[in-house]
């Protein structure tokens, strides 16, 4: 990918080893609001940045069941499933999406290289193939996203239900359209051959102009998960890839995919303890996915956790006066050491570390001074005009309206207890993708005069 391609036109980009990653086009505020008001097209996960891995063979489904917490019961061609892999401790090794694209072919997203490691050691009649550089990956979301896609495809796509996918064409190019997304509301993905990336992107972009389509960069994309209540790998928590020597040796052979967890930098009051940052499905609200009616790696540990019934995932709404005090600490003169910055980023993601690696931010959540969990994924919610984060906390303190504090600041620096209130979860309170009836949405493919 080059900076001259359509995806990068008008973008402020981050240079990565595999190409340019657009960070912002019109500014993250406008790009975030597009998911609520019109529609966006995003490429944050396009190209080599996203691990795409096919699992094929007679034992493909048996293999997936053996390594995932969900059983894939009733999983049909044309469906999509969320999948989570754990280690023996029940800690999440990765989570992502599986699309069944043929009888014995399952295309996975963000499950490799952990999935590949498990496959190589499975002893089953199953094969794996890396597709990461072979497929483009566009995300569209917002109330007019379906209209945009139909205008580009010249086809009625209303039949694609939530969690489903099927083939279509855009500009004469075969594409797979999936109905899912991280923004909370109506959302789709468009996948196709990497060689057709620019042609497909330009066709969608041009078709979307009458509907107010906005280009979305990585910064706006990273702000969606907290608001929509989707805890995400490499955003809300790191993965225990390098705590197992055999696994670590394997990941070292995948240098383009081990980036997020080989060289970790830890920010926030939780400090350098990686174990305090690793999570289980129950901590982050995914316990409902666990199916104990099949054997899988981590089952015994998760059974113990299910019995303990200790954790809850919540939204934390930050007190604006306490946040303002952290900002004000920068302006109290040279004799006062300020708190860690909270105002120079819309979230706690650090792009420019000056060295290889990836940064994770987590803060302790306190109840009457006692640690009850962690806060991660802090964002400035543009739509709701609040600062919020996700909390993985003791469920005894998880009732909406409960007042807690977040300890802000790295160990050894000035720290402040910021008041937070447990809010609704997810914080996104508009109509959700899985509940939207698209029947009332216009069909541009059937109306050549369609416009805004």
Swiss-Prot record:
It is an enzyme of class 2 (transferase). Optimum temperature is below 40 degrees Celsius. Its EC number is 2.1.5.1. One of its GO terms (molecular function) is transferase activity. Keywords: Transferase. It comes from the Bacteria. It catalyses: (+)-sesamin + (6S)-5,6,7,8-tetrahydrofolyl-(gamma-L-Glu)(n) = (+)-sesamin monocatechol + (6R)-5,10-methylenetetrahydrofolyl-(gamma-L-Glu)(n); (+)-sesamin monocatechol + (6S)-5,6,7,8-tetrahydrofolyl-(gamma-L-Glu)(n) = (+)-sesamin dicatechol + (6R)-5,10-methylenetetrahydrofolyl-(gamma-L-Glu)(n). InterPro entries: GCV_T_N, GcvT/YgfZ/DmdA, GcvT/YgfZ_C, TrmE/GcvT_dom1. Induction: Expression is induced in the presence of sesamin. Changing residue 221 to A: Loss of activity. Optimum pH is 7.5-8.5. PANTHER family: AMINOMETHYLTRANSFERASE, AMINOMETHYLTRANSFERASE, MITOCHONDRIAL. Homotrimer. Belongs to the GcvT family. Converts sesamin into sesamin mono- and di-catechol. Catalyzes a ring cleavage to transfer the methylene group to tetrahydrofolate (THF). Also active with (+)-episesamin, (-)-asarinin, sesaminol, (+)-sesamolin and piperine. This is Sesamin methylene transferase. It comes from Sinomonas sp. (strain No.22). The gene is sesA.
């Amino acid at each position: 990918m080059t900076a001259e391609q359509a995806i990068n036109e008008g973008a402020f980009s981050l240079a990565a080893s595999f190409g340019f990653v657009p960070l912002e086009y019109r500014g993250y505020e406008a790009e975030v609001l597009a998911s609520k008001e019109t529609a966006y097209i995003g490429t944050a996960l396009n190209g080599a940045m996203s691990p795409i891995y096919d699992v094929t063979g007679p034992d493909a489904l048996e293999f997936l069941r053996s390594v995932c917490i969900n059983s894939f019961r009733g999983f049909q061609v044309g469906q999509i499933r969320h999948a989570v892999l754990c280690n023996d401790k029940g800690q999440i090794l990765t989570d992502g999406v599986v699309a069944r694209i043929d009888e014995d072919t399952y295309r996975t997203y963000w499950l490799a290289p952990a999935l590949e490691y498990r496959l190589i050691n499975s002893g089953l009649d199953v094969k794996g193939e890396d597709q990461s550089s072979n497929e483009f990956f566009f995300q569209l979301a917002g109330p007019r996203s379906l209209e945009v896609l139909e205008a580009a495809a010249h086809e009625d796509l209303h039949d694609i239900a939530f969690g489903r996918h099927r083939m279509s064409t855009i500009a004469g190019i075969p594409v797979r359209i999936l109905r899912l997304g991280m923004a909370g509301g109506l959302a789709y993905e468009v996948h196709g051959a990497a060689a057709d990336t620019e042609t497909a992107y330009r066709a969608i972009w041009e078709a979307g102009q009458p509907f107010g389509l906005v280009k979305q960069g990585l910064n706006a994309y990273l702000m969606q998960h907290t608001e929509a209540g989707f805890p995400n790998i490499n955003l809300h928590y790191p993965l225990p890839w390098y705590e197992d020597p055999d696994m670590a040796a394997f990941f070292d052979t995948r240098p383009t995919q081990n980036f997020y967890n080989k060289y970790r930098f830890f920010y926030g009051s939780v400090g350098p303890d990686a174990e305090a940052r690793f999570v289980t499905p129950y901590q982050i609200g995914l316990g409902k996915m666990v199916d104990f009616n099949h054997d899988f790696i981590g089952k015994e540990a998760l059974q113990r956790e299910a019995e303990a019934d200790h954790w809850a995932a919540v939204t934390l709404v930050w007190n604006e006066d306490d946040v303002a005090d952290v900002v004000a600490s920068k302006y109290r003169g040279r004799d006062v050491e300020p708190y860690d910055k909270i105002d120079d980023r819309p979230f706690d993601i650090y792009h420019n570390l000056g060295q290889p690696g990836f940064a994770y931010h987590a803060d302790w959540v306190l109840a009457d001074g006692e640690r009850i969990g962690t806060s991660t994924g802090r964002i400035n919610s543009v739509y709701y005009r609040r600062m919020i984060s996700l909390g993985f906390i003791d469920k005894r303190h998880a009732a909406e309206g409960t007042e807690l504090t977040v300890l802000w600041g790295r160990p050894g620096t000035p720290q402040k207890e910021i008041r937070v209130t447990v809010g609704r979860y997810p914080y996104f309170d508009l109509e959700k993708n899985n509940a939207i009836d698209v029947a009332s949405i216009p069909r541009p493919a059937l109306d050549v005069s369609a416009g805004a």
